[in-house]
Amino acid sequence: YGLVGSEMCIRDSYKVLFLQGGASLQFAMIPMNLMKNRVADYIVTGQWAKKAYQEAQIYGKANKIATSEDKTFSYIPDCSDLPVSPDADYVYICENNTIYGTKYKKLPNTKGKLLVSDVSSCFLSEPIDIEQYGILYGGVQKNIGPAGMVIAVVREDLITDEVLPGTPTMMKYKIHADNGSMYNTPNCYDIYMCGKVFKWLKAMGGLEVMKQRNEEKAAILYDFLDQSKLFK
């Protein structure tokens, strides 16, 4: 907890949870814990955001307030003046879409609404301002460790007993926060391996260094594509 928290500059007002079920389970866990008004807004920029949007429809009114599906998710829509629902409990995004090669360069203007973000494919790849998010989560298999676990960073005031009726105990953020992510037998191997990566990240110089290294690696590919006559 301490290593990932220090690398991400997570303040005491957030909890770091090590949860099972992968990132896909969060598609249900988020509305179960947050959809108090039974309304949430989704920006659909790829298949993962689309799956989250479809899952949320089970629990309440999920509004698709922006999408790039008209051009096969090949761009991020303008999110500067979104039609945010007045009674929305949160606005949901998938921040990086590896299938389509798109990433938010600027977080959407949620007009004061809680921002929930799936950062699975860019987790711990660059510094972030955690205070811009209510919940930020990522499946560890992309950047951090073996498949089978998700790390969720949840603002403390969102961790309550006020969840949707019928929410299973294992699907409540509070039960995991109150038990140090060990309400049931934790994914010990994943946590151990993630710990190794956290220590390596720190030894390498932290997230600023990771950002620089990732940009240098990406430049090799994109420079080649820019100079290629085949790819336009």
Regions found by a protein language model. Give the residues of each.
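Active-site C-terminal subdomain of aminotransferase-like
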Residues: 140-222
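Conserved beta-loop-alpha segment that forms the PLP phosphate-binding cup at the N-terminus of a helix
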Residues: 14-41, 49-52
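Conserved PLP-binding catalytic core of the aspartate aminotransferase-like
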Residues: 231-232
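Single conserved hydrophobic/aromatic residue that forms the stacking wall/gate
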Residues: 1-5, 9-10
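General beta-strand structural signal in soluble alpha/beta enzymes
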Residues: 16-20, 42, 64-67, 93, ...
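Conserved active-site segment immediately N-terminal to the catalytic lysine
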Residues: 116, 130-141, 150
